[in-house]
Amino acid sequence: MEIKQMLVPVSRYSVLCPYEMNPTEITFHNTYNDAPAINERNNVANNSTGTSFHIAVDDKEAIQLIPFNRNAWHAGDGTNGRGNRHSIGVEICYSQSGGARYRKAELNAVEVIAQLMIQFDIPISKVKTHQERNGKYCPHRMLDEGRVQWFKNQCANRASSIKNSNKTQETGKVEIIVNKFNKVVTYEFGTALVPEMLGMMDALGYESRIISYGDKQGLVRFETAYRQGNELDKATAWLDAKGLKYFYTKE
């Protein structure tokens, strides 16, 4: 996903990002409002409190406002805390009311965080919530819905997928991994099933992800790399029980 640069003026660095930084971690947040990314960027650029973060992600775009080689004040763990001094802060928009816009913002954040993990060689163990930094109840919507681990799994799976894709492009060869070469792609289904579906896939150990929200509001498409054998029957039986239609592909 493209990260649009709209950096704050250098004159604001002394307040918003006074220290140089070599990012080794990532912290993700919910904004707790229903404003788009551009509003979040502008609020930080003009505030006098010093509160800041690196990227705001909504359902349409990701905007970077602080350079990745500067710190930002988003983690609440003090002047020398790892969150404030060593992590890239990612704010996910539209979390107050939720709905389709928020779900899409979440999926966009997965893409952004996965890209950052690869760019800065950050392992998933260093991708943390605001709550893990200083105890604040954030990201509030993910915590309310019990989906923090699901979100982290999505980031890890997406980063792995991008790495494998890059490796294939570099070598010019298609690498076939035993037990992971068949994909199953669902047709469109409602967002209400997303946490349950991906939770089930995670429990079975599959690499899976949402691939599209489709043309209809609130409808998504999903793919997973299935292993062959008895586990395949368990997963497809679950899809069948939910009345979800799917097809197999090796592409």
Swiss-Prot record:
Its EC number is 3.5.1.28. Residues 38-140 form the N-acetylmuramoyl-L-alanine amidase domain. GO terms for cellular component: extracellular region. Its main location: secreted. One of its GO terms (biological process) is peptidoglycan catabolic process. SMART domains: Ami_2. Transmembrane segments: none annotated. InterPro entries: Amidase/PGRP_sf (IPR036505), Amidase_C (IPR021976), Amidase_domain (IPR002502), NAMLAA_amidase_2 (IPR051206). Gene3D superfamilies: Peptidoglycan recognition protein-like. It holds the Pfam family CBD_PlyG. GO terms for molecular function: N-acetylmuramoyl-L-alanine amidase activity. It comes from the Bacteria. It is found in: Secreted. It catalyses: Hydrolyzes the link between N-acetylmuramoyl residues and L-amino acid residues in certain cell-wall glycopeptides. Residues 1-37 form the signal peptide. Keywords: Antimicrobial, Bacteriolytic enzyme, Cell wall biogenesis/degradation, Competence, Hydrolase, Secreted, Signal, Sporulation. Retention of enzymatic activity was limited to the N-terminal fragment (AA 1-196). Autolysins are involved in some important biological processes such as cell separation, cell-wall turnover, competence for genetic transformation, formation of the flagella and sporulation. Belongs to the N-acetylmuramoyl-L-alanine amidase 2 family. This is N-acetylmuramoyl-L-alanine amidase CwlA. It comes from Bacillus sp.
